[in-house]
């Protein structure tokens, strides 16, 4: 748990409670902005993270997820007046900031726009960046909410522009708060109004050493990502999640019928994002290496468990599903992607092509059995050579024995 304490701005008060940061790089924020009379004028509670793609000095591309940058400040956050609407402004490191602007109409108020600024000159976050400086991405939202209603959106919302993907979830916000009291009337976003069936989850009973109870093979689903009118990423797979939290092991089969896919495709990276009523996001990030092969580089997950807690893990240093560009990777047998000690993904009937998809169809597949063959060939050759060596030695000793026997007879 990392706590940030904010101090009052002249003319307003601001309280930011502790940030609880899971293994995934995200910010959980709760904000209470007060006016000069110490009455609440704006309330917000939300989670967000940012994924940024940038070019390196060797002309390759990297993808990073923005993480904690130290002490958070709030310069520029205001309740609003007759000339300016309310604004939430958060700074979390030199050159890193996020702003949300609100406007008001006769009977509604709007989350008008958000902007995110990041500093590629920060060598810790953006190692080997080719271009250094502060870049800003602006997004117009115009989300209209009835006055004196609290806006809620637990579902994942994704904003993608240029090389930045912004993720928001568990959002609660009310601007133009009346009489200093946050409303109990909630206005839901469209995604929260649509109920979906949750995937089946099995959790074992806690014990000193718990292991997941074996489950049936998960159903394979087909997922795709489009770039305009063209399909740029294809994936077919059955997914089984193995999660360990607080010595409790869970096995979760992903139901493809209630799982939605989104993502993005770029020249050197591709993202497949899955979400459902319990999975905020399950990201598979692919990358190009040596300009002629692709592989699974990163997996990020954040999801609700049956006990109501949120499980979040990220690993951007993986190396799975390696295949030549222009082909697909296929593995019908069960495989395990080990994301961390607490999280593994079992895949079944896997086929994936994150780059160079043509006419919405898979290209020729490289089968995972080829990897096994590559491993077995040197073993087989070594065994054969060992066998030949043994035969030569046996022949030598037999010949030597007969030679000595001839001398004894003479």
Swiss-Prot record:
Induction pattern: In peripheral blood B cells isoform LAMP-2A, LAMP-2B and LAMP-2C are up-regulated in response to treatments that stimulate immune responses via the Toll-like receptors TLR7 or TLR9.
Classification via InterPro entries: Lamp2-like_luminal, Lamp2-like_TM, LAMP_CS, Lysosome-assoc_membr_glycop
Cytoplasmic compartment spans: 400-410
UniProt superkingdom: Eukaryota
Any one GO molecular-function label of the UniProt entry: enzyme binding
Tissue-specific expression: Isoform LAMP-2A is highly expressed in placenta, lung and liver, less in kidney and pancreas, low in brain and skeletal muscle. Isoform LAMP-2B is detected in spleen, thymus, prostate, testis, small intestine, colon, skeletal muscle, brain, placenta, lung, kidney, ovary and pancreas and liver. Isoform LAMP-2C is detected in small intestine, colon, heart, brain, skeletal muscle, and at lower levels in kidney and placenta.
Membrane spanning stretches: 376-399
Stated name of the protein: Lysosome-associated membrane glycoprotein 2
Signal peptide, first to last residue: 1-28
Disorder named in the UniProt entry: Danon disease: DAND is a lysosomal glycogen storage disease characterized by the clinical triad of cardiomyopathy, vacuolar myopathy and intellectual disability. It is often associated with an accumulation of glycogen in muscle and lysosomes.
PROSITE patterns: LAMP_1, LAMP_2, LAMP_3
Region ranges (Disordered): 199-221
Lumenal topological segments: 29-375
Glycosylated residues in this chain: 32, 38, 49, 58, 75, 101, 123, 179, 195-196, 200, 203-204, 207, 209-211, 213, 229, 242, 257, 275, 300, 307, 317, 356
């Amino acid at each position: 748990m990392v706590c940030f304490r904010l101090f009052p701005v002249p003319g307003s008060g601001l309280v930011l409670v502790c940030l609880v940061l899971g293994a995934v790089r995200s910010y959980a924020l709760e904000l209470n902005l007060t006016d000069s009379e110490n009455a609440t004028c704006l309330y917000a509670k939300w989670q967000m993270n940012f994924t940024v793609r940038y070019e390196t000095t060797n002309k390759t591309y990297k993808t990073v997820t923005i993480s904690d940058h130290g002490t958070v400040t709030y310069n520029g956050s205001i309740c609003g007046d007759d000339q300016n609407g309310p604004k939430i402004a958060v700074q979390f490191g030199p050159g890193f900031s996020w702003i949300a602007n609100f406007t008001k109409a006769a009977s509604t108020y709007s989350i008008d726009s958000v902007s995110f600024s990041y500093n590629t000159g920060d060598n810790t976050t953006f190692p080997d960046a080719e271009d250094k400086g502060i870049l800003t991405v602006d997004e117009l939202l115009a989300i209209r909410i009835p006055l004196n209603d609290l806006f809620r959106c637990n579902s994942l919302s994704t904003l993608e522009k240029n090389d930045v993907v912004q993720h928001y979830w568990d959002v609660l916000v009310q601007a133009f708060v009346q009489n200093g009291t946050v409303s109990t009337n909630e206005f839901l976003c469209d995604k929260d109004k649509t109920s979906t069936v949750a995937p089946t989850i099995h959790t074992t009973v806690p014990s000193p050493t718990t292991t997941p109870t074996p489950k049936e093979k998960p159903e394979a689903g087909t997922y795709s990502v489009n770039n305009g009118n063209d399909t740029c990423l294809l994936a077919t797979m059955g997914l089984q999640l193995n999660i360990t939290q607080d010595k409790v092991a869970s096995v979760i089969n992903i139901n493809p019928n209630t799982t939605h896919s989104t993502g993005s495709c770029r020249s050197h990276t591709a993202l497949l994002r899955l979400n459902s009523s319990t999975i905020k996001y399950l990201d598979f990030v692919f990358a190009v290496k040596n300009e002629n092969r692709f592989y699974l580089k990163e997996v990020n997950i954040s999801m609700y468990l049956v006990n109501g807690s949120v499980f979040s893990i990220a690993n951007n240093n993986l190396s799975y599903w390696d295949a030549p560009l222009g082909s697909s990777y296929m593995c019908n047998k069960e495989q395990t992607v080990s994301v961390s000690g607490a999280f593994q993904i079992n895949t079944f009937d896997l086929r994936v092509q994150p780059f160079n998809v043509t006419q919405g169809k898979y290209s020729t597949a490289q089968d995972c059995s080829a990897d096994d063959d590559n491993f077995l060939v040197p073993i087989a050759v070594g065994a054969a050579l060992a066998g030949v060596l043994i035969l030569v030695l046996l022949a030598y000793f037999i010949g030597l024995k007969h030679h000595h026997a001839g001398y004894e007879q003479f």
